[in-house]
Structures are given as C-alpha cells and as structure tokens.
Amino acid sequence: MQEEQLDIYYLRLSKEDGDVEAGTAEESMSIASQRRCIEQFVLHQPDLSLEMEEIVDDGYSGTNMDRPGMQRLLRMVKAGLVRTIIVRDLSRFSRNYLEGGYYLECVFPLYHVRFISINDRFDSKQMGEN
C-alpha cells in the first residue's frame, strides 16, 4: 500500500537575513511570518490539505541546497512522498537561481510535485507541469 502524499511548506531564513539572534527565541520572526502567510494562503485553496507538514531551515543560507531541511525535503520528493511544496517566495527555496530552476523545471515535474511560490504568483499546476 502506497503512503499518502504530503503537502509541505518549506520555511527558510539565513543568519545574513538579519532576524536570527542566537539564544533569544526558538525561531526567527521571519519564520513565523512565512508560516502565517502560507497558512492564510492554504485556507483559500480547496485543493490543498490543511494538514500540511512543515520543514524549516532557520539560520541557513539559500545559496546552496546543503541545508538539513532541504535535504530532507529532497529525499522525500525522490521517495514519492510529496504532492505539493509551498514557499512564501522563491528566495526562501533557493537564492541560486540556476540550481533552484533545475529543481523547478526538471526534478519536481519528474516526480509530479506541484510547486507554489505565493508572493511570486507561481504555481506549477497552472503551468501544466503537474
């Protein structure tokens, strides 16, 4: 029996983005802001599950994909466990636009993963990729 595919929201903030102060809070304010943005978006999308899994990389640069949460997400994609990935904007997914574009154009379509970037108004489903 195949496991049910998940809708995942991915949150990221690097230390360089300026909102991470060691020892002052469990997570940055920007992470909380990204979470609220995605939760509000999902409320108005009947084709998305309200029971989403969250993956967070707080304090990691987006210039490469070598982040614990991102590596977990990519393993899940390759295992066929992910239906949808939602980010607030593309820079939260990757600041390396060539590498990020490779996943958006090649990897995610191969695994039939829908990718949504809210602020960029990008939805791969509307592009006919999934």
At which residue positions do the language-model features occur?
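Short, structured surface patches at the beginning of a domain
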Residues: M1-N130
